[in-house]
Amino acid sequence: MIKNHFTFQKLNGITPYIWTIFFILPFYFIWKSSSTFVIIVGIILTLLFFSVYRFAFVSKGWTIYLWGFLLIGISTASITLFSYIYFAFFIAYFIGNIKERVPFHILYYVHLISAAVAANFSLVLKKEFFLTQIPFVVITLISAILLPFSIKSRKERERLEEKLEDANERIAELVKLEERQRIARDLHDTLGQKLSLIGLKSDLARKLIYKDPEQAARELKSVQQTARTSLNEVRKIVSSMKGIRLKDELINIKQILEAADIMFIYEEEKWPENISLLNENILSMCLKEAVTNVVKHSQAKTCRVDIQQLWKEVVITVSDDGTFKGEENSFSKGHGLLGMRERLEFANGSLHIDTENGTKLTMAIPNNSK
């Protein structure tokens, strides 16, 4: 199987293109040559190097060796002919982006040996132009030694972070699935029998309504009591779920509004204390839905959130300075507001909508649902 050793576009962005801008520098060294033939050869080698360099970054399989050795050969020739060692920076960066261990080490050591031999050859010949660059030559060789490992380490860390993020998302999905299955089991075990009982008693009351009205009334009263018990058990099950806290949701909506370039205004007052987890969870979901509507539909510049703890209820107000075209009745039926109203009414809460001077949603829910 042929493997991709690295992905140029995804992992590197425009960085290699920025590096390519520096292709002008080799021409300075080429013009220092006295021979026209050598100058022509130098120009060809420089243009060839950057062309190969681009292809090397999108190579895969065995071609990575072909382009890698060709780059090293051009760099070695440039050191020998023009005392230009700085192609080593480009090659070191290229090698550092190789994912696979074997080609990384092969090209790394071949590059180091060839660069060191070519530099030593120029040093032995005592080329004057090369000797004036000795401090920069040393820096370049040190970079050629360290840079590939530094880049490879950073790329490995980025890949591990991506894998970790994917794993966390998968775990979160599995947790949600397990939670759904648990809730389904609890609802089945808790409500299945009672709903069957309600159905049987309702059917019995229907048959007795003319024959024995008093017995039918008793059966209907029993149905009513069973329904209330079932509702309380549903609320207990929902309350036992891992809820969304209001403070966490405030952080989330702040990030959402900032990303949409909408000013978020919130002045923290006395935080609600006497509120059940179920009611807090319902308010958090409604708050998220309300802010999502602001971002998607209002074209607002500012969004204000107020949370008040009253004697009998907690009130959250979400207001914006956006515009809404249409009637309030049609507005209240769309944009997820029907679901918000149903959630709040489930906990004996309420939703009020005002579309004058922007949009204002007022959500109220009892301190403790009964």
Curated annotation (Swiss-Prot):
The keyword Phosphoprotein applies. It comes from Bacillus subtilis (strain 168). It is found in: Cell membrane. GO terms for cellular component: plasma membrane. It is an enzyme of class 2 (transferase). The keyword Cell membrane applies. The modification Phosphohistidine is found at H188. It catalyses: ATP + protein L-histidine = ADP + protein N-phospho-L-histidine. One of its GO terms (molecular function) is ATP binding. The chain crosses the membrane at residues 11-31, 37-57, 71-91, 104-124, 129-149. It comes from the Bacteria. Keywords: ATP-binding, Cell membrane, Kinase, Membrane, Nucleotide-binding, Phosphoprotein, Transferase, Transmembrane, Transmembrane helix, Two-component regulatory system. This is Sensor histidine kinase DesK. The gene is desK.
